[in-house]
């Protein structure tokens, strides 16, 4: 099952909790600026790359605008992972980027 979280709610949690954030944008997009602490796992490599993820963790998934992350969440959920889609993606990110 996929859940969604608004950027406002996510950012509040992000500031106070140690969340697992996966950015599914392509490498060049990630390198141009990403949320501090995010791990890059591009959607194009997700079918193999997801195997690195711990099935006992909850992951928040982000992209640029929310479309790719929603697709990634559907796939990851089908693999048995617990995931939450961050709505609005980096377009809505209010904080600093690395």
Per-region residue spans from a language model:
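Short, surface-exposed ligand- or partner-binding patches at beta-edge/loop junctions that are enriched
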Residues: 62
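Phosphate-rich cofactor/ligand-interacting catalytic cores and adjacent structured alpha/beta frameworks
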Residues: 23
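Rhodanese-like catalytic fold shared by cysteine-dependent sulfurtransferases
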Residues: 1-19, 27-58, 67-98
């Amino acid at each position: 099952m996929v859940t969604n979280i608004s950027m406002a709610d996510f950012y509040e949690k992000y500031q106070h909790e140690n969340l697992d954030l996966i950015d599914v944008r392509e490498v060049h997009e990630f390198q141009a600026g990403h949320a501090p602490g995010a791990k890059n796992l591009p959607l194009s490599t997700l079918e193999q790359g997801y195997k690195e993820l711990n099935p006992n963790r909850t992951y928040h998934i982000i992209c640029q605008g929310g479309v790719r992350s929603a697709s990634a969440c559907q796939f990851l959920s089908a693999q048995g992972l617990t995931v939450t889609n961050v709505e609005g993606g980096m377009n809505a990110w209010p904080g600093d980027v690395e």
